[in-house]
Swiss-Prot record:
Belongs to the mycobacterial PPE family. Pfam families: PPE, PPE-PPW. The chain crosses the membrane at residues 81-101, 106-126, 133-153. It is a multi-pass membrane protein. Its main location: membrane. Keywords: Cell membrane, Membrane, Transmembrane, Transmembrane helix. It comes from the Bacteria. The keyword Nucleotide-binding does not apply. It is found in: Cell membrane. This is Uncharacterized PPE family protein PPE66. GO terms for biological process: response to host immune response.
Length: 315
């Protein structure tokens, strides 16, 4: 049994070989650009399968050897049942606890777990990097291939489609022209502008009519209301209450009123008068006394107004 166990342990693949195989597999997958590592990856997977087959064969041989050894061992009679087995159980507990809590086995288990976690994280990292590189390199090629395919399809099927769609395009154009004209006119002219133009025309006509009527006005006689004459007071003549005679008001004088042929003129401030000879301002404006070393008049007023009486040039 001991020899069979030692032989099986020596024939089994070691953890170092398994870790090296996993690392090589991750590196090959991460650098497999355009399938350049296809053959090395296949060899790596074949080596991994070989290790599995080797381990399975070794375990099968060891299982057969152990079964044969157990079958060839002499069968002993079972031990009698012990009613008071406290001493034996108590003596077996330290051995069981020592075998279970062996520091070497615990450290080995922890190391194996850490190695597996490292290998798994390394595979995930290499897979992410590999797929990212593959996407970055292949995506432009895929887009370029699609562009070429669509360009070829457009060259092949473009002219027949244009010939088929030309009647529909002409029909749409004929329908769209009057619609676009009506839409543009409705959006260009504001709502209610017709009423505004009609009111403006009627206002201009009324202004012209009033002007013509003003020009043809004839002198009009106006009879101003005369003030009632002063009569004697009732205190002087008490009988005025009984007999009262109403004297007719004297006839007033007629006055003629004509429309003026000039307006009120240019209005300004008090104490100033406008000059009709001064033209409308145009271009730059030059103040009086604007030569070098001069000073403005006090007070400074527009050039179209007379200066105030007594205002002189400032020295």
């Amino acid at each position: 049994m001991t020899t069979a166990y030692a032989s099986a342990l020596a024939a089994m693949p070691t953890l170092t070989e398994l870790a090296a195989n996993h690392t090589s597999h991750a590196v090959l997958l991460g650098t497999n650009f355009f399938g350049i590592n296809t053959i090395p990856i296949a060899l790596n997977e074949a080596d991994y399968a070989r290790m599995w087959i080797q381990a399975a064969t070794t375990m099968s041989i060891y299982e057969g050897t152990s079964d044969a050894a157990l079958a060839s061992a002499p069968q002993t009679t079972p031990a009698p049942v012990l009613f008071n087995g406290g001493a034996g159980v108590a003596s077996a507990l330290p051995a069981i606890s020592a075998a279970t809590l062996d520091p070497a086995s615990i450290i080995g288990i922890i190391i194996e777990i850490l190695i597996q976690l490292f290998l798994i994280s390394l595979e995930i990292l290499f897979a992410i990097v590999a797929y990212t590189i593959i996407i970055v390199l292949i995506l432009p090629l895929v887009i370029f291939a699609y562009a070429i395919v669509f360009a070829v399809l457009a060259i092949i099927f473009g002219p027949p489609l244009l010939v088929i769609a030309s009647p529909f395009v002409l029909t749409g154009s004929v329908i769209a022209v009057p619609t676009s004209l009506s839409t543009s006119l409705s959006t260009a002219v504001p709502i209610g502008v017709g009423q505004y133009l009609a009111d403006l025309a009627s206002a201009d006509a009324q202004a012209i009519e009033v002007g013509l009527k003003t020009a043809d006005v004839a002198p009009v006689a106006v009879r101003p209301a005369a003030a009632p004459p002063l009569r004697e007071s009732a205190a002087v003549r008490p009988e005025a209450r009984l007999v009262s005679a109403v004297a007719p008001a004297p006839a007033g004088t007629s006055a003629s009123v004509l429309a003026s042929d000039r307006g009120a003129g240019v209005l300004g401030f008090a104490g100033t008068a406008g000059k009709e000879s001064v033209g409308r301002p145009a271009g730059l404006t030059t103040l009086a006394g604007g030569e070098f070393g001069g000073s403005p008049s006090v007070p400074m007023v527009p050039a179209s107004w007379e200066q105030l009486v007594g205002a002189g040039e400032a020295g």
